[in-house]
A protein has these predicted regions:
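Non-catalytic pre-domain segments flanking phosphatase-related domains
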Residues: 1-27, 46
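Active-site loop/short helix in cyclic nucleotide turnover domains
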Residues: 35-36
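Active-site phosphate-binding/coordination module
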Residues: 42-133
């Protein structure tokens, strides 16, 4: 059996067991097209509807993003979806954003580096985005 055929067989089997299956997807570049600046990003309505429908079927549906978790929620806007932000450093749980404990020791240094990048690069036209536990 080819790798591709084996992968399709596994996917088919998982689709037949929705009560134990999670569907996880990246947001930017997968659900939302890549755009010049983050504020221009948008998840098409038909994909939001698709996420809503599959969230009713599968055990877990999650959106994963390099954005802040709140920004990922704003892009999709569905309470039934679990949101992981900042490349997995954050999770939206019960309406609250939690930063994973392993990331907390680095928070102060990330903020220092973000400030330094903004100070040195913004005057040259670079866009520096503060995202809490990360920066871009």
């Amino acid at each position: 059996m080819t790798d591709r055929k084996a992968a399709w067989e596994r996917l088919r089997a998982w689709s037949e067991e929705p009560g134990v299956t999670a569907v996880l997807t990246d947001i930017d570049g997968t659900l939302a097209p890549i755009v010049p600046t983050p504020d221009m990003s948008e998840v098409p309505a038909e994909l939001k509807e698709w996420l809503r429908r599959i969230s009713e079927r599968y055990l877990l549906v999650a959106g994963i993003s390099g954005r802040k978790t709140e920004d990922a929620l704003d892009l999709i806007g569905l309470d039934a979806v679990v949101y992981f932000g900042n490349h997995g450093f954050e999770i939206l749980r019960d309406g609250e954003v939690e930063v994973i404990p392993e990331a907390l020791p680095y928070l102060e240094r990330v903020q220092e580096l973000e400030g330094l990048a903004r100070e040195r690069l913004a005057p040259q036209g670079a866009f520096v985005e503060e995202k809490g536990i990360t920066a871009s």
